[in-house]
Amino acid sequence: MNQLLREVLTPDAERTQNFTVGDTVKVHYKIVESGKERVQIYEGVVISVANEANGKTFTVRRVSYDVGVERIFPLFSPRIAKIELIRKGKVRRAKLYYLRNLAGKAARIKELKGGKALVSEDRKRQQAAAATKSTTTE
C-alpha cells in the first residue's frame, strides 16, 4: 500500500518543500463552491512542519481582525495550487507554538540575513518551473 501511495503522490520539483518553520508564505489553495473553482490565498507564518514523506503537513498562522487563525495544509495536496515564499525567518525552534500567547510586536519574527536573496532565488526557480511546465503542456 505504501508503495502505491508513493507512486501516486510523487513530489513534483515545484512542490518540494522550499520553506522552513518561521518563514512567511502565501498558500494558493483551490476551493470548490457549488461547482465553481476559485483560488484563495492564505498568508501567514509557518509555525510547524509535521510528519515525513507523502503525508507531510505544515501549519500556517496569521492574525485576522485581532484573532489568531491557524490552518493545517497537506504539502502534497492536489488542492494547493502553489506555495509562495515571502520572507525567511530567523528562529531557533522546530515548533513556534509560543506565538499563540504573544500579541502585536512581540509576535514578530526577525528576518534571516541574506533571506531576501533566498526569496528572490526561490521565485526565479518557481518561474522557471512554471515556464517548463507550460512548454511541455503545449
Curated annotation (Swiss-Prot):
GO terms for biological process: translation. One of its GO terms (molecular function) is structural constituent of ribosome. Keywords: Ribonucleoprotein, Ribosomal protein. One of its GO terms (cellular component) is cytosolic large ribosomal subunit. It comes from the Bacteria. InterPro entries: Ribosomal_bL19 (IPR001857), Ribosomal_bL19_CS (IPR018257), Ribosomal_bL19_sf (IPR038657), Translation_prot_SH3-like_sf (IPR008991). Coiled coil: none annotated. Signal peptide: none annotated. Belongs to the bacterial ribosomal protein bL19 family. This protein is located at the 30S-50S ribosomal subunit interface and may play a role in the structure and function of the aminoacyl-tRNA binding site. This is Large ribosomal subunit protein bL19. It comes from Leptospira interrogans serogroup Icterohaemorrhagiae serovar Lai (strain 56601). The lineage of its organism: Bacteria, Pseudomonadati, Spirochaetota, Spirochaetia, Leptospirales. The gene is rplS.
